[in-house]
């Protein structure tokens, strides 16, 4: 195996990491450090904070976010499948039907458990 073929990929990764890290390091090293009370105080739309910033969120928000990610991922798999359906034939069709069936079973389970009810 010839590792010279991977040199452009490694160089690309190093340049990408450098572009992301260099401004952060330069800002930390060259930026002014003059903290004072007003700068370190919490800010809430021009007013003093009314309550503690660490409020509890309802678990349903997180559950809806996770469900959104799952079904968004389903669409990410569904689009390339639909584009290449003619090339993959019946095997690809039935593989996607099994995948969609598993997701539908999961969706029905979440619905029956009441994960989508806000009451």
UniProtKB/Swiss-Prot annotation:
Question: Would I find Cell inner membrane among this entry's keywords?
Answer: yes
Q: What is this protein called?
A: NADH-quinone oxidoreductase subunit A
In terms of Pfam families, this protein maps to: Oxidored_q4
Instruction: Tell me the keywords, alphabetical order.
Output: Cell inner membrane, Cell membrane, Membrane, NAD, Quinone, Translocase, Transmembrane, Transmembrane helix, Transport, Ubiquinone
**Oligomer and partners:** NDH-1 is composed of 14 different subunits. Subunits NuoA, H, J, K, L, M, N constitute the membrane sector of the complex.
Tell me which species this is from.
Leptothrix cholodnii (strain ATCC 51168 / LMG 8142 / SP-6) (Leptothrix discophora (strain SP-6))
Q: Name one GO cellular component term.
A: NADH dehydrogenase complex
Q: What enzyme class is recorded for this protein?
A: translocase
**EC numbers, comma separated:** 7.1.1.-
Tell me where in or outside the cell this protein is found: Cell inner membrane
Q: Known catalysed reaction(s)?
A: a quinone + NADH + 5 H(+)(in) = a quinol + NAD(+) + 4 H(+)(out)
Q: Give the main location.
A: membrane
InterPro entries documented for this protein: NAD(P)H_OxRDtase_bac/plastid, NADH_UbQ/plastoQ_OxRdtase_su3, NDAH_ubi_oxred_su3_sf
Q: How does it sit in the membrane?
A: Multi-pass membrane protein
The family database entries (Gene3D superfamilies) matched by this protein are listed as: NADH:ubiquinone/plastoquinone oxidoreductase, chain 3
One GO molecular function term of this record is:
NADH:ubiquinone reductase (non-electrogenic) activity
Record's function text = NDH-1 shuttles electrons from NADH, via FMN and iron-sulfur (Fe-S) centers, to quinones in the respiratory chain. The immediate electron acceptor for the enzyme in this species is believed to be ubiquinone. Couples the redox reaction to proton translocation (for every two electrons transferred, four hydrogen ions are translocated across the cytoplasmic membrane), and thus conserves the redox energy in a proton gradient.
Instruction: Spell out the family assignment given in the record's similarity comment.
Output: Belongs to the complex I subunit 3 family.
Q: Which domain of life is it from?
A: Bacteria
The regions listed as transmembrane in this protein's record are 9-29, 63-83, 88-108
